[in-house]
């Protein structure tokens, strides 16, 4: 199963700016029976992008649930498949003359900086020449990012919600 997508309305906009974006969409929150959004608020769950666009179709939801279950069944094998998908997306970007950017938390909030494949190395360190970016509601991850403890090619943006507005970063 191919885990990353490079073809949707959001990624097409980036192509006009010189970027090919590869995004991993999992079943958000606890939709698959396993929670991939540990800091999701009620408002976050209610307004989740999971059902936007093609996500409204049952086959897309089924695929997201299957990917999420595959991740929890064998995280190392899942990361290895992601590495293959990233390499394929990189070749696609090179052929098109685009720069590849990777977003692993399209509809999740997992600490990919701590998840390694068979070699135990996270994807950002395996592909140090690529840009990775994500949004997170996890303040500990943002603090680690701001302190320079995450891979240099990984950017995190704090995602505000109705119950985390009191959190400030300096």
Set out the residue ranges of the language-model regions.
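Class I S-adenosyl-L-methionine
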Residues: 1-170
């Amino acid at each position: 199963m191919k885990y990353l997508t490079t073809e949707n309305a959001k990624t097409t906009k980036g192509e006009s700016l010189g970027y090919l974006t590869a995004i991993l969409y999992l079943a958000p929150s606890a939709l698959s029976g396993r929670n991939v959004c540990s800091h999701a608020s009620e408002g976050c769950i209610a307004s989740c992008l999971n059902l936007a666009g093609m996500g409204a179709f049952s086959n897309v939801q089924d695929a997201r649930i299957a990917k999420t279950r595959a991740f929890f069944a064998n995280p190392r094998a899942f990361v290895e498949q992601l590495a293959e998908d990233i390499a394929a997306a990189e070749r696609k970007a090179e052929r098109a003359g685009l720069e590849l950017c990777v977003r692993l938390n399209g509809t999740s909030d997992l600490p990919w900086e701590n998840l390694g494949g068979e070699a135990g190395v996270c994807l950002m360190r395996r592909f140090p020449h690529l840009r990775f970016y994500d949004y997170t509601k996890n303040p500990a991850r943002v603090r680690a990012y701001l302190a320079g403890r995450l891979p240099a090619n990984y950017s995190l943006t704090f995602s505000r919600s109705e119950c985390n507005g009191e959190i400030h970063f300096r």
